[in-house]
Regions:
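Active-site-adjacent pocket scaffolds in enzyme catalytic domains
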Residues: 1-77, 133
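C-terminal domain-boundary segment and adjacent tail
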Residues: 9, 57, 61-137
Length: 137
């Protein structure tokens, strides 16, 4: 369906640490996957249950510490950091401060670009298509 409706990217899979081009039925597509991991999603930190035994709510500082740690490793490896956020979760006052803290931390580093998914795929598409072409030679 993503091909049929002309999607440029997807961020639905947890299967890699780097972006890649999708194939459908063994055929190449233009759809870029921007994979992410649960540690880079806001939901696991703040979704909770009032029924025991259940998950308890985390402090926003736990999210900030985890995301800064992930950023530091990914930055050292010259990799992309894909974050999953939900307005009803991250948009709470104390939680948005944690996101601001991550952005401030990231921007203290050189050559960091924070962009929308469509901007990222436009930037990385030529390199991914070139790599796929060279791999099939």
């Amino acid at each position: 369906m993503l091909v049929e409706y002309g999607f440029d990217y997807s961020s639905n899979f947890f299967d890699d640490d780097s972006p890649y081009l999708h194939e459908v039925d063994g055929k190449p597509t233009r759809i870029i996957e921007l994979p992410f991991r649960w540690v880079l999603d806001d939901a696991p930190f703040f979704q909770y249950s009032i029924v025991l035994p259940g998950r308890t709510m985390q402090a926003p500082s736990a999210l900030l510490e985890a995301w800064k740690g992930e950023f530091d490793v990914l930055y050292a490896e010259d990799r992309m950091m894909m974050i999953g956020m939900h307005p009803e979760i991250i948009g709470q006052p104390s939680r948005i401060r944690a996101l601001e803290g991550l952005i401030e931390h990231a921007l203290r580093h050189k050559n960091v670009w924070i962009g929308r998914c469509d901007e990222m795929v436009d930037d990385m598409r030529p390199g991914l298509e070139r790599a796929r072409s060279e791999a099939h030679r």
